[in-house]
């Protein structure tokens, strides 16, 4: 039960942080590229790499690890929004943005996890 509560708290915190960061990015100006979701997902990949490495290394309680990874990172990042925005780019005929977004998100996401692990080791 404690794990569920901590995951819940982490998820809510991650969702609020995602909203605040996304709004902050979109206030910078309009573009055809979904920079807010892109930035959130890449940052979330870096964070999950950091959290997994640090919690393994310093032997943090598994409940805290779940709160940070499944809760915070799960609430912060968003695959469903990424998928929806990708489809909208495709439907709008914005093919360069569509391919850049998909390839960039996947490649930079993987590199972000690697960076997070490297930074934490």
UniProtKB/Swiss-Prot annotation:
Parts of the chain that traverse the membrane: 5-25, 33-53, 66-83, 98-118
Catalytic activity, reaction form: fluoride(in) = fluoride(out)
Activity regulation (UniProt): Na(+) is not transported, but it plays an essential structural role and its presence is essential for fluoride channel function.
Superkingdom in the source lineage: Bacteria
GO terms for cellular component: plasma membrane
Pfam families in alphabetical order: CRCB
GO-annotated biological processes: cellular detoxification of fluoride
GO molecular function, one term: metal ion binding
Localization terms from the record: Cell inner membrane
Membrane topology listed for this record: Multi-pass membrane protein
Keyword terms, alphabetized: Cell inner membrane, Cell membrane, Ion channel, Ion transport, Membrane, Metal-binding, Sodium, Transmembrane, Transmembrane helix, Transport
Entry binding sites for Na(+): 74, 77
UniProt xrefs under InterPro entries: FluC
Function: Fluoride-specific ion channel. Important for reducing fluoride concentration in the cell, thus reducing its toxicity.
Family: Belongs to the fluoride channel Fluc/FEX (TC 1.A.43) family.
Stated name of the protein: Fluoride-specific ion channel FluC
Originating species: Phocaeicola vulgatus (strain ATCC 8482 / DSM 1447 / JCM 5826 / CCUG 4940 / NBRC 14291 / NCTC 11154) (Bacteroides vulgatus)
Organism ancestry: Bacteria, Pseudomonadati, Bacteroidota, Bacteroidia, Bacteroidales
Gene name as annotated: fluC
């Amino acid at each position: 039960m404690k794990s569920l509560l901590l995951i819940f708290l982490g998820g809510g915190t991650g969702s609020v942080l995602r909203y605040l960061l996304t709004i902050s990015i979109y206030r910078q100006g309009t573009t055809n590229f979904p920079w807010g979701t892109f930035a959130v997902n890449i940052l979330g990949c870096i964070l999950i790499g950091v959290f997994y490495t640090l919690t393994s290394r310093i032997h943090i309680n598994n409940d805290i690890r779940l709160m940070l990874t499944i809760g915070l990172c799960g609430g912060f990042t968003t695959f469903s929004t990424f998928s929806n925005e990708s489809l909208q780019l495709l439907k709008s005929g914005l093919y360069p943005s569509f391919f850049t977004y998909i390839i960039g998100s996947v490649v930079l996401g993987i590199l972000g996890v690697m960076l997070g692990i490297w930074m934490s080791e």
